[in-house]
């Protein structure tokens, strides 16, 4: 469904991509490697090692072999509880402590990349923060909070949020850096043409917003009365629950990306009105 209305030359199963690239690399100008196993509740490390680490190494090595520039998806999950802040400084990568095997697999690849002597002539890894936007119907539990908020409000008329279990945060005041997928695409498109300043970058708006802000904007976009309930954060994740994430995007700006990002209000309004209410995908 995500491919409806889009233009593409070939659909290649992931297990055949290396052989496909061997035979077609002259037709390829740029590689975006964004696919991964992203389930933060999956604890089978073998799956992450195969799909997120070893597969990504293969893509990197093919890009080196054929002289292809590469952009790949890292993740803000690499930052763990933010003990070292949220700076995309290469020097802190070896010291980061992700909270789950997914985040660990992403950080392991970042570490591997920074150790490589042979690199594509241009490469960039992007630590995506909380991305939301069209074409996430297939993602189940791992879809964005905006998507789940819309679904919950549509089905029950209300929205449940985790209450705070810390004195320095009020209920619903936990913050995330929510970034609209159109902004993500714009940044990647910019680097496809820029092809300078290789490195690992944060990709968020640089402005953390509360879950209350998010919920209220979804209610407003749906034209519904605001009914928000607070529930306990499950005990098994309470100690590892992030209360604040915010991308430091100064490095992105220094690389020349100057466009404004969608505000949470703008992004949610467009996403709900243009895609969720009519049940449409981008391209339909």
For every predicted segment, state its role.
Residues 5-8, 14, 20-51:
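NAD(P)H-binding glycine-rich loop region in Rossmannoid oxidoreductase-like domains
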Residues 30, 43-58, 100, 104-105, ...:
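Glycine-rich NAD(P)-binding loop of the Rossmann-fold in SDR/ketoreductase-type enzymes
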Residues 30-33, 57-99:
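Conserved Rossmann-fold NAD(P)-dependent oxidoreductase catalytic core, especially the SDR/UDP-sugar
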Residues 40, 87-103, 132, 170-171:
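Catalytic loop of short-chain dehydrogenase/reductase
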Residues 75, 111-137, 159-167:
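Conserved beta-loop-beta element that borders a ligand/cofactor-binding pocket
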Residues 84, 97-129, 148-155:
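Active-site Tyr-X1-5-Lys
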Residues 99, 129-143, 163-181:
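Glycine-rich "substrate-gating" loop/helix at the edge of Rossmann-like oxidoreductase active sites
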Residues 153-284:
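C-terminal substrate-binding subdomain of Rossmann-fold SDR/epimerase-dehydratase oxidoreductases
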């Amino acid at each position: 469904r995500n491919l409806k209305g889009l233009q593409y030359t070939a659909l290649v199963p992931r297990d055949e991509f290396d052989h496909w690239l061997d035979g077609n690399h002259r037709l390829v100008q740029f590689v975006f490697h964004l696919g991964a196993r992203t389930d933060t509740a999956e604890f089978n490390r073998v799956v992450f090692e195969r799909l997120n680490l070893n597969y990504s190494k293969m893509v990197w090595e093919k890009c080196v072999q054929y002289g292809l520039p590469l952009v790949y998806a890292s993740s803000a999950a690499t930052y763990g509880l933010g003990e070292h802040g949220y700076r995309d400084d290469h020097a802190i990568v070896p010291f980061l402590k992700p909270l789950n095997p997914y985040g660990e697999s992403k950080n392991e690849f970042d570490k591997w990349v920074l150790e490589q002597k042979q690199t594509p002539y241009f490469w960039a890894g992007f630590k995506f923060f909380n991305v939301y936007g069209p074409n996430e119907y297939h993602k189940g539990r791992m879809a964005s909070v905006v998507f789940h908020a819309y679904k919950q409000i549509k089905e029950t008329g209300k929205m449940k949020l985790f209450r705070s279990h810390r004195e320095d945060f009020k209920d619903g005041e936990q913050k995330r850096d929510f970034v609209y997928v159109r902004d993500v695409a714009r940044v990647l498109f910019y680097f496809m043409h820029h092809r300078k300043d290789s490195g690992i970058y944060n990709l968020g708006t640089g402005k953390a917003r509360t879950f209350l802000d998010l919920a209220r904007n979804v209610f407003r976009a749906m034209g519904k009365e605001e009914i928000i309930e607070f529930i306990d954060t499950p005990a098994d994740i309470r100690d590892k629950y992030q209360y604040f994430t915010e991308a430091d995007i100064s490095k992105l700006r220094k690389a020349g990306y100057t466009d404004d990002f969608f505000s949470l209000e703008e992004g949610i309004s467009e996403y709900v009105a243009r895609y969720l209410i009519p049940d449409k995908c981008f391209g339909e």
